Amino acid sequence: MIQMQSMLDAADNSGARSVMCIKVLGGSHRRYAHIGDVIKVTVKEAIPRGKVKKGDVMKAVVVRTRKGVRRPDGSVIRFDRNACVLLNNTTEQPIGTRIFGPVTRELRGDKFMKIVSLAPEVL
């Protein structure tokens, strides 16, 4: 569960290292974001010569959470850290060309098929 002020790792090569959630998109009083939800983030730590810099406000999709996701068969997939992939603000396509770490099958949809295809492992 990601809410405002939550810190996340950037799971791509966009240049951001850590980001902070500043808004959960999709409803006026929506409080929590789960895997596959789009959030608004600000870059808190970035590497030199990256595509984004510290202070940039971007959209991002949550790909890993400590809370995890429950499958219809009753199993739960949890991760050690919260992580997201930064998106272009207008097209909502990933900024980076590589994805680091596993992503879940819940991202398989029309919107995020690119992220699933770039990921090294889909759980």
From Swiss-Prot:
PANTHER family named among the record's database cross-references: 50S/60S RIBOSOMAL PROTEIN L14/L23, LARGE RIBOSOMAL SUBUNIT PROTEIN UL14M
Top-rank taxon, per record: Bacteria
Species in which this protein is naturally found: Vibrio parahaemolyticus serotype O3:K6 (strain RIMD 2210633)
Oligomeric form and interacting partners: Part of the 50S ribosomal subunit. Forms a cluster with proteins L3 and L19. In the 70S ribosome, L14 and L19 interact and together make contacts with the 16S rRNA in bridges B5 and B8.
Role according to the record: Binds to 23S rRNA. Forms part of two intersubunit bridges in the 70S ribosome.
Designated name of the protein: Large ribosomal subunit protein uL14
A Gene Ontology BP annotation from the UniProt entry: translation
InterPro entries: Ribosomal_uL14, Ribosomal_uL14_bac-type, Ribosomal_uL14_CS, Ribosomal_uL14_sf
